[in-house]
Swiss-Prot record:
Domain Myosin motor, first and last residues per copy: 12-696
Quaternary structure annotation from Swiss-Prot or TrEMBL: Interacts (via its IQ motifs) with CALM.
Listed GO biological process terms: actin filament organization; actin filament-based movement; endocytosis
Function: Myosins are actin-based motor molecules with ATPase activity. Unconventional myosins serve in intracellular movements. Their highly divergent tails are presumed to bind to membranous compartments, which would be moved relative to actin filaments.
Written domain comment of the UniProt record: Binds directly to large unilamellar vesicles (LUVs) containing phosphatidylinositol 4,5-bisphosphate (PIP2) or inositol 1,4,5-trisphosphate (InsP3). The PIP2-binding site corresponds to a putative PH domain present in its tail domain.
Name used for this protein in its record: Unconventional myosin-Ic
Limits of the TH1 domain: 850-1024
Protein's organism: Gallus gallus (Chicken)
One Pfam family here: Myosin_TH1
């Protein structure tokens, strides 16, 4: 990097304007050589950048380096592409004027690489968003796609552009790229069918064969070996060490997806590329009449499938020619030479039109879409021109003629904008100036493009005139028309010495870049660009969507003769010149250091030739004698008026006087500027940069002042708006409150009136007079009921209803009780439910009948009063599988003597069992239990009545239990004898056995006493606990 060098003299000056001997061409070239040796490939001539192709990678294009040049004044950093790119970008943003960067130089000088580096710089340094990033990617990825289809390896350049490209990049008001458009010029279609020795066809053919997947190649009917294809072997240079076709194929496939190609479009596009290769392999043989016949049917099959046409129709179209004369169709066979011409013409037409379609497809992808960038309608444009350089080959044909004509037009533009226009401007503005001599190539441009007498006009005339026109007749017409032109020479017009270097079918033009000898062979054919009608018809019927778009059916019906290739190119160049003239140009002049494409090799002779024909010395002399910056007074004053108190904020006088006051305030020295008639001219860039720096500082203070003023204005405006809003809200709110209050009063009066009237009619049937009162009464009762509902089923409270709601109140009370009961039942556990069921049965049996029942109510019934451990194991064993449901200790009284004996009463699933220690004394099946008797007193005796016909039973059983209510309830439920419990008053009779009866007498007394009476009865004295 230049910034790392301490001795600037050792590496030359970075601006040729600083050369002491600026008129010496040798000094100019020596300065280039010094810098090239130190890898300093960029040098300025004022604002023009001179670039020497290093033929090697240099570490000067990193993102860090891009940031170094971002937003920095032109001369504050060392010369670089990025400086030119950034200067154009800043001019575009600050002055809102379209810019263009013109990159010129001969083939191999590095123009295409320069274009890519500039696009990369904008992609990194411009403002970004998701949509903008998409546009950036598409702009960058359009390059590898167009290079694959439009670039090739030539003798002088391994990546030579064989078409001209002008790209417009659209920027929004923030400086972000939002779209783009590409114009292409004169694709070298002849390369599809013919290449010179050491050259290749277009890159895409080799990339497809080298990088294409096996499945893809099989579908396209291709093999990986390029030697198998007639159109790829003519240059004998299928593989090049500096080109990696396989990697480039991956780049192209990725780029196609980024610029919105779907899979079907890629397949159709590659089918067309493959069809060109197959078309080149179509061979012909002559029949007995000398007419051509296709000998490679296999190729026709592939072509029919790839181009989506009828194979037989395509075959016939390749060996026949259709002519329409006076409304009649005439079909004539072709000979071998004509058939080969037709095949090659079709291959060139397919590829050329597909390339144009491809450019249009890329343009659709790059097009600025307002929907994606809402509100960004104002856009400016920066153009990049990358067009073929001046070409001189051993054999120069129609393509070189057009390319060199294009370079003449660009040189003319350069002269117009930098040399001639600059000197004319000094004269018109009255600025003292020493004229600089330069060669004006307008004379050469006129020789080529002049109407009626120019080479293109003569060529078109020969192509269009009736009769047998040939390349030779064209040359003769040239000799006749422009024989006296100083820049034109042929074998016939040359002197004896010159004739030795000129063939009889050649002419020589003395271009601004030197002499070029052109062979007229093929000029007429290439200018006509003829494709037989039946081949056009075949392509128009193709079902391949791309081919269908490329070959328009209107061509078949349009009787107007199409423009020739040279005229189309001339008109395209004319439009391009108009585009470039409308923009503010920046120049990059590219130089090729040697023809061998070797790094670190400086061919002084070759470079001197390029310096001369690029007009760099004339450009340098103009820059040394002239001024670096000039602007109209109005523009200059508008931009810098804020730097002077007298001109800010407005100047009411003449702009000339305002600028004079401004530069005086800025302290410009007399030698630093000149005042013209309509413009100010500033000689030194440093003067302008100092002014720009002062403006940047001033902008900060102005921005602060503007912000303060705006904030004050905005706050005051906001305050006044809030004040007005507050007054409006207060007024509205006071009105609202008043209206609410009036409405409330009116409602109150009406309510009171209706209430009183309803009260008067309260006992009448429902009518309009009392419906409001009745509704209010109903509502009040329901609200009161809501607040005073019973809390549980035992709560019997209920609000007293009005007379009209008695029936409804009763229904509601029932519903409420049902709901509480349902809620309570839903909440109780199975154990508690069982307890309640037993209590309910006990209530049904004993309530109001048994004196000691009330004392049993608060006591819970127990599942059993004896555990298994309290029952003898022998008893349990004897019961086997019978589960004991309830067990309780009891006292048994003998049937005769009424002796009391301790026993256990067990209830099983099927029987009542009485147990004495380890022995079962008596088992009474529930079926044999006829009833149970108990007294109404508070004693605990009860009698189990047994069926008398059962011989196993000894008679009824008299028992006493401390839990008589519990025991009898469980026994009744188990035996299903709830209705068979008898509660007796006075005495109970029971069966003793053998038809005898016993009697138990019950007497009220002060305390419990059980004894045998003298009359043989069992007397039970029991205290009365409750009065009935």
């Amino acid at each position: 990097m230049e910034s790392a060098l301490t001795a600037r003299d050792r590496v030359g000056v970075q601006d040729f304007v600083l050369l002491e001997n600026f008129t010496s061409e040798a000094a100019f070239i020596e300065n280039l050589r010094k810098r090239f040796k130190e890898n300093l490939i960029y040098t300025y001539i004022g604002s023009v950048l001179v670039s020497v192709n290093p033929y090697k990678e240099l570490e000067i294009y990193s993102k860090q380096n891009m940031e170094r040049y971002r937003g920095v004044s032109f001369y504050e950093v060392s010369p670089h592409l990025y400086a030119i790119a950034d200067n154009s970008y800043r001019s575009l943003r600050t002055e809102r004027k379209d810019q263009c960067i013109l990159i010129s130089g001969e083939s191999g000088a590095g123009k295409t690489e320069a274009t890519k580096k500039i696009l990369q710089y904008y992609a990194v340094t411009c403002p970004a968003s998701q949509q903008v990033e998409t546009v950036k990617d598409r702009l960058l990825q359009s390059n590898p796609v167009l290079e694959a289809f439009g670039n090739t390896k030539t003798l002088r350049n391994d990546n030579s552009s064989r078409f001209g490209k002008y790209m417009d990049v659209q920027f929004d008001y923030r400086g972000a790229p939002v779209g783009g458009h590409i114009l292409n010029y004169l694709l070298e279609k002849s390369r599809v069918v013919h290449q010179n020795h050491g050259e290749r066809n277009f890159h895409i053919f080799y990339q497809l064969l080298e990088g294409g997947e096996e499945d893809l190649l099989r579908r396209l009917g291709l093999e990986k070996n390029p030697q198998q294809y007639h159109y790829l072997v003519k240059g004998h240079c299928a593989r090049v060490s500096s080109i990696n076709d396989k990697n480039d194929w991956k780049v192209v496939r990725r780029a196609l997806s980024i610029i919105s190609f779907n899979d079907n479009e890629v397949e159709d596009l590659l089918s067309i590329v493959a069809s060109v290769l197959h078309l080149g392999n179509v061979q012909f043989a002559a029949d007995e009449q000398g007419n051509a016949q296709v000998t490679t049917e296999n190729q026709i099959k592939y072509l029919a499938r790839l181009l989506a046409v009828e194979g037989s129709v395509l075959r016939d179209a390749l060996i026949h020619k259709k002519i329409i004369a006076k409304g009649e169709e005439l079909i004539s066979p072709l000979n071998l030479e004509q058939a080969a011409y037709a095949r090659d013409a079709l291959a060139k037409a397919i590829y050329g039109r597909t390339f144009s379609w491809l450019v249009n497809k890329v343009n659709k992808s790059l097009a600025y879409k307002e929907g994606e960038f809402p509100g960004w309608r104002s856009t400016t444009v920066l153009g990049l021109l990358d067009i073929y350089g001046f070409e001189v080959f051993q054999h120069n044909s129609f393509e070189q003629f057009c390319i060199n004509y294009c370079n003449e037009k660009l040189q003319q533009l350069f002269i117009e904008l930098t040399l001639k226009s600059e000197q004319e401007e000094y004269e018109s503005e009255g600025i003292a100036w020493e004229p600089v001599q330069y060669f004006n190539n307008k004379i050469i441009c006129d020789l080529v493009e002049e109407k009626f007498k120019g080479i293109i006009s003569i060529l078109d005339e020969e192509c269009l005139r009736p009769g047998d026109a040939t390349d030779t007749t064209f040359l003769e017409k040239l000799e006749e028309t422009v024989k006296n032109h100083p820049h034109f020479l042929t074998h016939k017009l040359a002197d004896q010495k010159t004739r030795k270097s000129l063939g009889r079918e050649e002419f020589r033009l003395l271009h601004y870049a030197g002499e070029v000898t052109y062979s007229v062979a093929g000029f007429l054919d290439k200018n006509n660009d003829l494709l037989f009608r039946n081949l056009k018809e075949t392509m128009c019927n193709s079902e391949n969507p791309i081919i269908n778009q490329c070959f328009d059916r209107t061509e078949l019906t349009d009787k107007k003769r199409p423009e020739t290739a040279a005229t189309q190119f001339k008109n395209s160049l004319s439009k391009l010149m108009e585009i470039l003239m409308s923009k503010e140009p920046s120049y990059i002049r590219c130089i090729k250091p040697n023809d061998a494409k070797q790094a670190d090799r400086f061919d002084e002779v070759l470079i001197r030739h390029q310096v001369k024909y690029l007009g760099l010395m004339e450009n340098l002399r103009v820059r040394r004698a002239g001024f670096a910056y000039r602007r109209k007074y109005e523009v200059f004053l508008q931009r810098y008026k804020s730097l002077c108190p007298e001109t800010w904020p407005t100047w009411d006088g003449r702009p000339h006087d305002g600028v004079a006051v401004l530069v005086k305030h800025l302290g410009y020295k007399q030698e630093e500027y000149k005042m013209g008639r309509t413009k100010i001219f500033i000689r030194f860039p440093k003067t302008l940069f100092a002014t720009e720096d002062a403006l940047e500082v001033r902008k900060q203070s102005l921005a602060t002042k503007m912000q303060a003023t705006w904030r004050g204005f905005y706050r005051r405006k906001k305050f006044l708006h809030m004040k007005h809003s507050a007054i409006a809200i207060q007024s509205w709110w006071r009105g609202t409150l008043g209206r609410r209050k009036a409405a409330k009063r009116k409602w109150a009066v009406q309510t009171i009136r209706r209430f009183i009237k309803g009260f008067i009619y309260r006992n009448h049937p429902r009518c309009p007079e009392n419906e409001y009162f009745l509704d209010y009464i109903r509502f009040s009762f329901l609200m009161n009921l809501k607040r005073n509902l019973p809390k549980n089923v035992l709560d019997k409270s209920w609000p007293t209803p009005p007379p009209s709601l008695c029936e409804a109140s009763q229904l509601l009370r029932q519903l409420c009780m049902q709901n509480m009961v349902w809620t309570y039942c839903k909440r109780i556990s199975p154990e508690w439910k069982q307890q309640l069921e037993q209590k309910v049965i006990a209530s049904e049996i004993f309530k109001g009948k048994k004196d000691n029942y009330p004392q049993s109510v608060p006591r819970l019934f127990i599942n059993t009063r004896l555990g298994n451990e309290e029952i003898n194991a022998k008893v349990l064993q004897a019961l086997e599988n019978e589960a004991i449901k309830y067990a309780v200790p009891v006292i048994k009284y003998d049937r005769k003597g009424y002796k009391a004996r301790s026993r256990q009463l067990l209830l099983t699933q099927n029987a009542v069992i009485i147990v004495e220690d380890s022995k079962i004394k008596q088992r009474i099946d529930y079926a044999n239990l006829t009833g149970i008797s108990v007294s109404s007193l508070s004693d605990n005796l009860f009698v189990l009545h047994v069926h008398c016909e059962d011989n196993k039973q000894k008679g009824d059983v008299v028992l006493q239990s401390d839990h008589v209510i519990e025991t009898l309830t469980k026994t009744a439920m188990r035996a299903d004898k709830v209705n068979n419990i008898n509660i007796n008053q006075g005495s109970i009779k029971f069966t003793v056995g053998q038809g005898k009866e016993g009697i138990i007498d019950f007497i009220s007394g002060s305390e419990l006493l059980i004894a045998k009476a003298k009359n043989g009865h069992l007397t039970v004295v029991a205290p009365r606990l409750n009065s009935r």
